[in-house]
């Protein structure tokens, strides 16, 4: 285990849900790292579950997952030493905004990023680990165009705060309808929903469902995807936060929702793929592995694992 004296703390990169992040330098190797500092409650110390989850993350070695090199545990803080990445998908998309007009990414780049996102996700799901908090801010990109998933396991290690603060409302935009309606049976499908939201946002440059609270979030989802019912989603009416008085709406044509915001034509394969991710019923969503074998990715098959 490293000691904190091995690292020189450089500029602050940002504040996350759990931690403050700094750029750091490994004084021994000269390699840049990201230092994520989690302040510990002086009363309680580090929850053992957090340590357990974090040690799991150290075992997650994949080219599309940000490497966790080490964990430094001192009395009042936990410092996670991560591989340093130059950028994240949110900042990358923001940099393309012209004036106040968001711009989507070129579709070949969208496909390349989505492929890498699903490669990393499939690896984690095979290892029985959910992300739970996928959003453009924690998809990190380096100068070579490699995309890697960050913050894996942290949602589980530290718990997602229930009272979503304004800065954290972003997480809502990528949250699956089953979770919003109080489902406790989380499975890998919650990450797949987030992937669908991220895909739509890469195409248009704008979040697909930018709600400000759980109720509005569901309304935005149902306005586009249609209102769920028992025939489409058995047992939906039994979810704790299901609202029986919600106005029944048919689904809108997703291509018509997205096409005005991009110059490139959205083909049938892409739309079929997106529908496979954004199924209201979690049991109907594609798995990460199935998604990687979808015809939209045909040109990548020969690289597939």
Swiss-Prot record:
Q: What is its main location?
A: cytoplasm
So where's the catalytic machinery, residue-wise? Answer: 133 (proton acceptor)
Source organism phylogeny: Eukaryota, Fungi, Dikarya, Ascomycota, Saccharomycotina
The record's subcellular location field reads: Cytoplasm; Nucleus
Q: Which family does it belong to?
A: Belongs to the protein kinase superfamily. CMGC Ser/Thr protein kinase family. CDC2/CDKX subfamily.
Q: Which PROSITE patterns match?
A: PROTEIN_KINASE_ATP, PROTEIN_KINASE_DOM, PROTEIN_KINASE_ST
Q: Which UniProt keywords apply?
A: ATP-binding, Cytoplasm, Isopeptide bond, Kinase, Nucleotide-binding, Nucleus, Phosphoprotein, Serine/threonine-protein kinase, Transferase, Ubl conjugation
> What is the role of the protein in this entry?
Cyclin-dependent protein kinase (CDK) catalytic subunit that regulates multiple cell cycle and metabolic processes in response to nutrient availability. Associates with different cyclins, that control kinase activity, substrate specificity and subcellular location of the kinase. Regulates metabolic processes when associated with PHO80 cyclin family members (PH080, PCL6, PCL7, PCL8 and PCL10), and cell cycle and morphogenesis processes when associated with PCL1,2 cyclin family members (PCL1, PCL2, CLG1, PCL5 and PCL9).
E.C. no: 2.7.11.22
The protein here is known as: Cyclin-dependent protein kinase PHO85
Q: How is its activity regulated?
A: Inhibited by the CDK inhibitor (CKI) PHO81 in response to phosphate starvation.
Query: Binding residues for ATP, per the UniProt record?
Result: 13-21, 36
Q: Which residues carry this modification: Phosphotyrosine?
A: 18
Q: Where is this site: Not phosphorylated?
A: 166-167
SUPFAM superfamilies, per database record: Protein kinase-like (PK-like) (SSF56112)
Keyword Nucleotide-binding in record: yes
Q: According to the record, what happens upon gene knockout? A: Increases GCN4 level.
Q: Give one Pfam hit by family name.
A: Pkinase
Q: Which GO terms describe its biological process?
A: cell cycle G1/S phase transition; DNA damage response; establishment or maintenance of cytoskeleton polarity; fungal-type cell wall organization; G1/S transition of mitotic cell cycle; lipid homeostasis; long-chain fatty acid metabolic process; negative regulation of calcium-mediated signaling
Name the Gene Ontology molecular function terms of this record: ATP binding; cyclin-dependent protein serine/threonine kinase activity; protein kinase activity; protein serine kinase activity
Taken from the UniProt entry, a GO cellular component term is: cellular bud neck
The UniProt record's further free-text remark is:
Present with 6160 molecules/cell in log phase SD medium.
